[in-house]
């Protein structure tokens, strides 16, 4: 088998296809009373079971053609000014709404023309098309009419896809509108996500026009939350007063109702007296003055505080920004890809972000100074020495990083002492032992001591101030050897080898061990895994992953170890699995949007806002 990460190699083994050619050298139908083999056997009934994969699609296509030609149609839907011809049985099979209409005792069950009110005619046509084609495009221009129409017709799949589209559109300027829309149409999951987004990004949301237009009830719902992400309670007070002063004449009557949910006892004494207590609107309202006095007593009488505890004295506890994992580039279905996606363990969702400017498989990925670096790789035609850098706050890649001194694919990349190291790989001519490091302050690469062994498909890890180069291939065969670099001495030394030869393995530091998983040995892709204890200089096995994975990414996110993508010997993988060290077990936990072999992974803190997701303004539902 060829190396699946090298250009020109399919990565496909002999597999089951090779076994499909019989082994006897003879052929026959098995029918009739011809010859026998060995002992006499009783005749078996002739049977061939077949399930057509084409049949559902072909049938839908033909039914849709009948509809388009208005043949065998037995109902006409009058929606707005439009007449939509259809077949009752198709509508009833797809929609509980139509099933109840046409199979019960309703008057419509006996009518050939049915008028449906309170639904957008364009949305209805799209939904009827979906019933016949299983295909729909949800986009910004139609989602607000599609969702209520899907709710009316009880098309749950379309409701879900509309909610998914709106989740991807969330940003601080529209999250309140999406929240209200979700509430109106009883989309609980979208409402929950919009609520969390609003709480998490409150400092940006409070500056939006949507915030100033909130009804008083929704404003109270938001500022009541313990999860509100603010630096201090002063921000909540300022937000409330901005909302009030947007329309003082109508809103001043609600000031006390709203102010009771601002945690005035948590304000600084200076702000409470100088800003809140001196505000003319606050001073003119007796209930507001009582709230200010309550806060003053709390601040002035610390010995009485145990008796004064309540919702207004409880500090807010916003959810901390967790870590997220980025999957970068790789090899998918026979080609290098530039796509990048982000995994959030809190929601278990993969979202697309901005792609790189170049396709890169065998790319090295690491995070330095809160920026994600993609180093080298192969674009399907050429070996690369270029580098791209991703800023999650702007969702943009830049190409202003100095290139490495040589082209590298299947390269190991890691960060040590503020430098970005590129280790081994191959340049299209030979397997490399070269090592160089990047200084972000100087935007410059410089060579350091080479490894003692040439290594492509090498895994690298940083532990206790040392850089480890683990496994890989010397260009002839996979390696189990490991060496360690000391930057103070600029020297590589060997440490104990792994128990298994591995190239294109995944590697990460977890709980002060170096974990090495998957890869490929001389014969096959591996699911086995082991870990290195630097204190004893020993490797010990752990339980194998659920899948064989060569070209796998391995990373620690929020204290959990994730294995991402790879190649199992017959297929590129988009599955991920997570390891539990207490139970010594791996479990599958979702899928990426893209299959990835030889993609890089990097872990960063989640950005302050979620408004950077890379997606088209449309969401296509078709054979997903």
From Swiss-Prot:
Keywords: Actin-binding, Kelch repeat, Repeat, Ubl conjugation pathway. The keyword Repeat applies. Pfam families: BACK (PF07707), BTB (PF00651), Kelch_1 (PF01344). One of its GO terms (cellular component) is Cul3-RING ubiquitin ligase complex. InterPro entries: BACK, BTB-kelch_protein, BTB/POZ_dom, Kelch-typ_b-propeller, Kelch_1, SKP1/BTB/POZ_sf. One of its GO terms (biological process) is proteasome-mediated ubiquitin-dependent protein catabolic process. Residues 175-277 form the BACK domain. This is Kelch-like protein diablo. It comes from Drosophila virilis (Fruit fly).
